């Protein structure tokens, strides 16, 4: 089914206000969920909203909490999220990293006691739109087996790197081949995954999203490489924030909350003039996209460049929402 941006935001706002969330907080949160969905990231927008409300109802999320700065070391700051709403807190933290970068050339905010930030790419994009390089990542509850194991002991720990090119170039990737949100998107659409995404119950690689969702044997990106990167990202976020690791979140909390996150902004224009920056970025992009194609029907893509088209299509033709997901939201 198709809905407008206003219908989508209105549905989110209604549910949030029914939980006695303050009007300004409900409006800002609903706006972010709707913008994520409008941008084509359904897995962490509309599809994720019922799960967000479940955690809100369970008390994992404290909607009136205010993040507090704990430590300030020039370009580096440490904050405690106080388990406030995840997407609103993450936006504020990247804004703060940008402010620090304006003063120091680089800004790093390490956040502890945070909630799920929904679409991590929103915060990298936020920096790149203002001309900064944006880098951020989060740890999570253990939802992926380390390479060589059957039992979940590491997080998917998504990493975002956004570059202020025209259009913005951005990698937004989980340390698994697919996020659990994308497994859900493919399952709801009745599609197999385009490549192997995990193991079946017999330990064989599989493209069936429902099987992986059920047994939790999701495949690390690049096999042992994604597993290793997940581990070191967790370690850095834990140390810089003095927050909880994947192990602590998993063993000590009843659900995924109290996670640790990193937000970095770099002011490129302090290091290179605008014309040179643009020319160098364009040369990189042209060199890549003019390579001979392996398949004439498959374009060579640069990461993140598809979002401009997805956003335009959704604004022109309406936002696609799965019927079953919309029914869940209407019932909240």
Curated annotation (Swiss-Prot):
Reactions it catalyzes: 3-dehydro-L-gulonate + NAD(+) = 2,3-dioxo-L-gulonate + NADH + H(+); 3-dehydro-L-gulonate + NADP(+) = 2,3-dioxo-L-gulonate + NADPH + H(+)
Pfam family, one: Ldh_2
EC number(s) from the headed UniProt entry: 1.1.1.130
Binding positions for NAD(+) per the UniProt entry: 168-174, 224-225, 304-306
An example Gene Ontology CC term for this record: cytoplasm
Location of the protein in the cell: Cytoplasm
InterPro entries associated with the record: Diketo_gul_Rdtase, Mal/L-sulf/L-lact_DH-like_ah, Mal/L-sulf/L-lact_DH-like_NADP, Mal/L-sulfo/L-lacto_DH-like_sf, Malate/L-lactate_DH-like
GO MF term list: 3-dehydro-L-gulonate 2-dehydrogenase activity; NAD+ binding
Enzymatic class: oxidoreductase
Role description: Catalyzes the reduction of 2,3-diketo-L-gulonate in the presence of NADH, to form 3-keto-L-gulonate.
Subunit structure of this chain's protein: Homodimer.
The family this protein is said to belong to: Belongs to the LDH2/MDH2 oxidoreductase family. DlgD subfamily.
Protein name in the entry: 2,3-diketo-L-gulonate reductase
Native species: Salmonella paratyphi A (strain AKU_12601)
């Amino acid at each position: 089914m198709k809905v407008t941006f206003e219908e989508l935001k209105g549905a989110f706002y209604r549910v949030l206000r029914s939980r006695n969330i303050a009007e300004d907080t409900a409006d800002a949160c609903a706006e972010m969920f709707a913008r994520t969905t409008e941008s084509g990231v359904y897995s962490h927008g509309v599809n994720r909203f019922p799960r967000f409300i479940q955690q809100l109802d369970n008390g994992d999320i404290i909607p009136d909490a205010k993040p507090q700065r704990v430590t300030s070391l020039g370009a580096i700051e440490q904050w405690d999220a106080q388990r406030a709403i995840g997407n609103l807190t993450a936006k504020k933290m990247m804004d703060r990293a940008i402010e620090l970068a304006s003063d120091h050339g680089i800004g790093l905010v390490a956040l502890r006691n945070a909630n799920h930030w929904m679409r991590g790419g929103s915060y990298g994009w936020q920096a790149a739109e203002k001309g900064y390089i944006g880098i951020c990542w989060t740890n999570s509850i253990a939802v992926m087996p380390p390479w060589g194991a059957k039992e979940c002991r590491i997080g998917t720990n998504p990493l975002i790197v956004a570059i202020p090119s025209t259009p913005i170039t951005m990698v937004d990737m989980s340390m698994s081949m697919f996020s659990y949100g994308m497994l859900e998107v493919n399952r709801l659409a009745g599609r197999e995954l385009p490549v192997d995404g995990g193991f079946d119950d017999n330990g064989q690689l599989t493209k069936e999203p429902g099987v992986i969702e059920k047994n939790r044997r999701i495949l690390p990106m690049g096999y042992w490489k994604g597993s290793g990167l997940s581990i070191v990202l967790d370690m850095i976020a834990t140390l810089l924030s003095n927050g909880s690791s994947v192990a602590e979140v998993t063993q000590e909390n009843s659900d995924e909350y109290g996670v640790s996150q990193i937000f970095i902004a770099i002011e490129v224009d302090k290091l290179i003039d605008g014309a040179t920056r643009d020319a160098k970025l364009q040369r990189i992009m042209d060199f890549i996209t003019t390579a001979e194609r392996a398949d004439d029907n498959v374009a060579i893509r640069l990461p993140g460049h598809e979002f401009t088209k997805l956003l335009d299509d959704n604004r022109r033709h309406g936002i696609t929402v799965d019927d079953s997901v919309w029914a869940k939201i209407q019932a909240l």
